[in-house]
Amino acid sequence: MAAADQAGEVIGVELNRAAVRDAISSAKANGVKNIRFMAGDAGEFLEDMAARGERADVVFMDPPRAGSTEKFMDSVAKMGAGRVVYVSCNPETLARDLKYLKKKGFVAEGAWVVDMFPWTESIETVCLLKSNK
């Protein structure tokens, strides 16, 4: 939702239906009108978009601790996203996924560590990737 004021349209795709309901409620409560959410597999959603010739300028991805899937990352590359914002809670899977995305034509432009859980060992890392295609 934070990107909605910078975009013509924002689409959120999430497997967890309760999270989708919460996101819809939050968008309504905050008066965000150029956003829609759907429950489903984000990789399949991106594949369908690419098959229809649609593209996204920016893809935000926040995979589980196990990291992303090659299917999802292939879909990101296929649809021609110019930038990817990758949020990760696991530095090991982040490194693995960045290596894969590099093979798909993305380069890391910057990375930021966010201490969302003070006094714990947990961190979030946000990486900005740019397509070199």
How should these model regions be labeled?
Residues M1-K133:
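Rossmann-like S-adenosyl-L-methionine
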